[in-house]
Regions:
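Short hydrophobic beta-strand element within catalytic cores of glycosyltransferases
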Residues: 278-281
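Aromatic "clamp/platform" in nucleotide-sugar-dependent glycosyltransferases that forms part
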Residues: 261
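Donor nucleotide-sugar binding/catalytic pocket of nucleotide-sugar-dependent glycosyltransferases
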Residues: 123-165
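Nucleotide-activated donor-binding/catalytic signature segment of Leloir-type glycosyltransferases, i.e.
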Residues: 221-241
Length: 357
């Protein structure tokens, strides 16, 4: 499992499992940190340090399986690059020792990465042989349907509940828009700035707050872009925030923006829903399971045009914002708290899963 740092959706969920009283009291667990990146910007890079660390991870895993007999070996597997090579070696190692891999897919890309490569498809199929699989949503099963024909356990993410009443303020003027995520191009921060430039030119009032750690986009670039677009008096750059400071951002926001082509589920959407903040996001991965059916606004296309329309729609429709706030808050409470997540995972590990597809 990958643990923080760096902080991203997978490492956060793995940390929840590692610290779960329910899981650790019910099962005897050993944990090995599979993370090889030092920070968000390091995730997609290869280095000598990563190779050495990977050898240590494989050696430690070898020793653990040599000296223990596990019912499941839980691996959060990634579909791309060196991360997949490392993860696939671990899967094969588990099978070599006659133990059962349990692969938890937090991202998609297996289909896209193998559609034009027979070798990759064959290797994916080989890796996914004789394993159990967990997906975040039934909507994500299609990504592996060409390489895996077995049953899939469905386990949506859940986050700790820190807000117990819907405190959404629908009387803001101007309305505060929030982006709170790592500064990664695929998460749509540049798309947001382009859409807000258009709205600003039309005289539509708003405040936009940017919160998050640098990734493949750096804050100096964001600052220059904001000046170029004439948004200096509309945009507030805050950098990364955590804990209570982060929760205050949600509490004081009117609309949350995540026009991502990157996320399969979006933990940060759950954080916004916990505060009843209406969300705008992409119609990809498992995101429709969160904010579909009137619990948010889904963009059919990840484009400046669609994002501009979605933002304008929420900015100008107070009743819609209120309805979304009520629905999203209630849906989070009913489905996505950390207690619900831990219970569902416990049921999977006990052989009594809540949902199999």
């Amino acid at each position: 499992m990958q643990f923080p740092p760096p902080i991203h959706g997978v490492s956060v969920m793995n940390d929840i499992i590692r610290n779960s009283t329910l899981i650790n009291s019910k099962f005897q667990c050993d944990y090995i940190n599979l993370a090889t990146a030092k920070n968000i910007d390091d995730l997609q890079k290869n280095s000598f340090f990563k190779y050495i660390l990977t050898l240590k991870i494989i050696s430690k895993s070898f020793y653990k399986m040599l000296t223990n007999r596990y019912e499941y070996v839980y691996i959060t597997i990634f579909p791309f690059g060196f991360s997949f090579i490392k993860d696939s070696i671990l899967v094969l190692l588990v099978r070599f020792f006659g133990q059962q891999p349990l692969l938890h897919l937090h991202t998609y890309g297996f289909r896209e990465n193998s559609i034009y490569s027979k070798f990759k498809k064959k290797y994916y199929t080989f890796v996914f042989k004789n394993v159990n699989v967990i997906c975040l949503s039934p909507l994500l099963i299609e990504d592996i349907s060409h390489i895996y024909k077995g049953q899939v356990f469905i386990l949506p993410n859940g986050i700790p509940q820190v807000n117990f009443n819907n405190t959404y303020n629908n009387e803001q003027n101007p309305i505060t828009l929030l982006y709170l995520s790592n500064l990664i191009k695929g998460k749509g921060i540049l798309l947001i700035i382009d859409a807000l430039e258009r709205l600003n030119r039309k005289g539509i009032n708003f405040i936009f707050r940017i919160v998050g750690s640098e990734g493949d986009i750096k804050y100096p670039h964001i600052t220059e872009l904001i000046k170029l677009k004439g948004l200096e008096d509309k945009v507030i750059i805050l950098g990364p925030k955590f804990g209570d400071d982060k929760y205050e951002e949600f509490k004081n926001s009117g609309i949350f923006l995540l026009p991502s082509n990157y996320d399969t589920f979006g933990l940060v959407l759950l954080e916004a829903m916990q505060y009843g903040v209406p969300c705008i996001s992409s119609n990809i991965g498992g995101i429709p399971d969160l904010i579909g059916d009137g619990r948010g606004v889904l963009m059919e296309n990840i484009s400046v045009d669609d994002l501009e329309l979605a933002i304008n729609k929420l900015l100008t429709d107070k009743l819609l914002r209120q309805n979304i706030s009520h629905k999203s808050f209630d849906y989070y409470i009913s489905n996505f708290t950390v207690n619900i997540f831990e219970s569902r995972l416990s049921n999977i590990l006990s052989g009594n899963p809540d949902l199999i597809v």
